[in-house]
């Protein structure tokens, strides 16, 4: 059967003339093909069904309408038997991946129902079709459907009261991990870190199998799950302990889950088992070769919540969501796709383990000091393709011949890598020193069997080199002889007819034919049989040509089938070595990341931070890693930071414990009634604070300084060198930021309410080992309200939490806090004030500022001169008469 795409479609068909819902049809009146379509659609009611008909994949009924609307295609109709016409839309079969990708990106699941036999084999019956692929956002494998620089995670969650289990996998790379926790906020943050393309949720919802697109809601979706992901509602049965545990044992061929590290995490086991069942359901005959399940604990890593990732612009910018201008952009010097993904994972999951951090630092230092090794490694790494995903496609049976050639090219580079790092002492480089001989042999075999530049399609021949298989060579000789017979026929027929433009052609519909221009039709011999008339030519056949055609096509089919069998055998050999290849590919990825970080450190002048077990943050001449690269060399003004000295904390605790001077309670009671002159405030600067009150003009660089400290700490905990002259850094358990705020219209929250929610999260979760970066707390409400909240927040962090904190503010009254809380210090971003302007020096120095120069910032921004002049007049009046200028003196 072939698609009737020759029908003239209407771009705006009258919906009343065809049926657009498969549930409304009388199935007894449908033709065989449409009945099969409807029965298949019944099994996948929530997916878009692409149904192969000849050279097209077609959609009918409601899926046709959906396809046409979402991809802006023509919606037409086709006759479906006695039932009448039904809605139809379609795409060419050779381009199905592109259209399916667009649908998946929009949050749809796509079912591929393909023809599994040639139409010629059907012999008058319905061509056999089967579901061969189910594509969902989290189960993509094809290269064109994936972003090389990031993982494509499928996640599964199980929630029981406040406890939760999470499993996630990237089937394109084989990664498979699981974890469990007792704080739902940690689950939310893990999902935000992973950014899974799809999340499986067990439920008793009536619409099981449905896929909720981002932003769609369901009463069956737990409230703690962020609305920004695709959610698949699944049956609870595969997520039960009784089904999940045996499935994991069978998958990994183990007798106990103890070896996988998840035997004590029942919710994690349930999530992992449910995820495996989903892969079995969607991947059909293409089992996914997952790596061995790994179990981890969220609190084993530095926690960076979604707000902090956004504010620090770790993977994308706040302004326009682009990669360029992010921390990842500034650090990424990787040479492979695997390395790029690994660097992204490292940034989103920094280490707490000092030993692990130092091991990475040692490797970077070795590569910095050995320039020839670093340069040779980078040059060789550029020649290695994406081993992880190439292996994944081979293991799932979707790799083509070009994939295997790329894999062979990459594997053949590994012995060279091994030779380069022979003398290295780094555990990361030592992992490359021994390449299993089986991989070298596999690369040689692939190169020996596959042609250098094979076609994309794997069932149409042209894949295998000569002399690989005697039977293949014999069949190739037969086909070549047939091709020569065709060439000779063309020459002979030209001579017989005297028609010099005569050609012998071929297409899949008519087979071989003789083409003659219509102007020469009167010269056609009597034994020619007209087969087709076109605008400028006539096409003919002869009995001899048709007789030979059957032999030619049969021989070519036999040849193509044998090539396909040889190719699939090679692909299966690759799949058998998937675990070995992936183990080595992880080593390549880590080496690539560290090599890139070494290159970055050399060219940007980074230093090796000394990692400490205490709370100290001591940065000398630190620089913002992104802003620095965006400015001409030497333009960035470095600044130092000192926080969290243990000696001061011990002294402070001693004072509080002995109640000799100031207790925590007395601090809060004394604060409102204690006042200093502005000049005194500027002098109250402790040398080793836990909390810095940072004041200074608008646009002077306070926010940049805050982010700079956070980014340096984060970089250090992934093992990177940092942009500073010197750095001594204690390990942080969490980095919190509250920088800027906007209205959350979706939840009806004002800017101030968003700010308070973020601040509450920090106060409720920060510890003495956290780093807190606050910018402008309390500015979204009345002045005294905001000042009061800002004071109370700063005081609580300094006294009760003792987190290392930088608190940027325009409330200069907060400088008074340093006079009564010993672990608070005042710092300011300085300016040079001239008679008619100010010059921002961008230098952070001890002392508190007493002006914000907001009017000057307005002038620089282009406010009209008359507005600037009036603002100065109003300010003069306020300073003379308003109680605002009196600070905290009368708050009691």
Curated annotation (Swiss-Prot):
ATP binds at residues 696-703. Pfam families: MutS_I, MutS_II, MutS_III, MutS_IV, MutS_V. Belongs to the DNA mismatch repair MutS family. PANTHER family: DNA MISMATCH REPAIR PROTEIN MSH1, MITOCHONDRIAL, DNA MISMATCH REPAIR PROTEIN MUTS FAMILY MEMBER. This is DNA mismatch repair protein MutS. One of its GO terms (biological process) is mismatch repair. GO terms for molecular function: ATP binding; ATP-dependent DNA damage sensor activity; damaged DNA binding; mismatched DNA binding. Residues 663-684 are annotated as: Disordered. This protein is involved in the repair of mismatches in DNA. It is possible that it carries out the mismatch recognition step. This protein has a weak ATPase activity. InterPro entries: DNA_mismatch_repair_MutS, DNA_mismatch_repair_MutS-lik_N, DNA_mismatch_repair_MutS/MSH, DNA_mismatch_repair_MutS_C, DNA_mismatch_repair_MutS_clamp, DNA_mismatch_repair_MutS_core, DNA_mismatch_repair_MutS_N, DNA_mismatch_repair_MutS_sf. The keyword DNA repair applies. The keyword Cell inner membrane does not apply. Keywords: ATP-binding, DNA damage, DNA repair, DNA-binding, Nucleotide-binding. GO terms for cellular component: cytosol.
